[in-house]
Amino acid sequence: VTKESPTMIPHESSRILQQMGATVILPQLLGALGSVFAKAGVGEVIASLMGGVIPDGNRLLGVIGYCVAMAVFTMIMGNAFAAFAVITAGIGVPFVINLGANPALVGALGLTAGYCGTLMTPMAANFNIVPASILEMENKNSVIFVQAPIAIVMLIIHIIIMYLFAF
């Protein structure tokens, strides 16, 4: 298919990894950081903070708080898997699932709401910085600028779908 010999595989793999740099291992590091945050009790701290913002029993504000927090924390962490454990424990369970929402639907939509944040942050190097590096773009954030409006629309759609179908 490529008309290259198999001996080119190590050379080309090395070249691409060197071009991408340290961003290659960033997703794994961020995933590990998420588990450290979860073990440290960050979810409980977030739950206590959100308890003052989201009124008891308000499903809409619970859904909005959960989806937006997933996106924002994913932007900070750079990885939706890292944010998922912390935000679901801190907001998803007490403010959405405990109000009668379907946990499977909340989990699926919560995780993908986090991916809306992935599209809007340089911390998600594997999605945003690596493509800019490979394409040798002048502005390393160009990919993010293009993706941000779509990500915001998708986040709003996630909120609507979760509110309408999870309960």
Regions found by a protein language model. Name each.
Residues 54-94:
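Hydrophobic alpha-helical transmembrane segments of multi-pass integral membrane proteins
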Residues 41-60:
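Membrane-interface interhelical connector segments
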Residues 60-73, 99-120:
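Alpha-helical transmembrane segments of multi-pass membrane proteins
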Residues 1, 31, 66-74, 151-165:
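Hydrophobic core segments of alpha-helical transmembrane domains in multi-pass membrane transport
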Residues 2-9, 36-47, 75-81, 161-167:
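Transmembrane helix-loop junctions in multi-pass membrane proteins
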Residues 115-167:
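Juxtamembrane and boundary regions of transmembrane helices in multi-pass small-molecule transporters
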Residues 31-38, 74, 78, 112-120, ...:
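Helix-loop-helix module between adjacent transmembrane segments
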Residues 7-42:
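Core transmembrane alpha-helical segments of multi-pass membrane transporters/permeases
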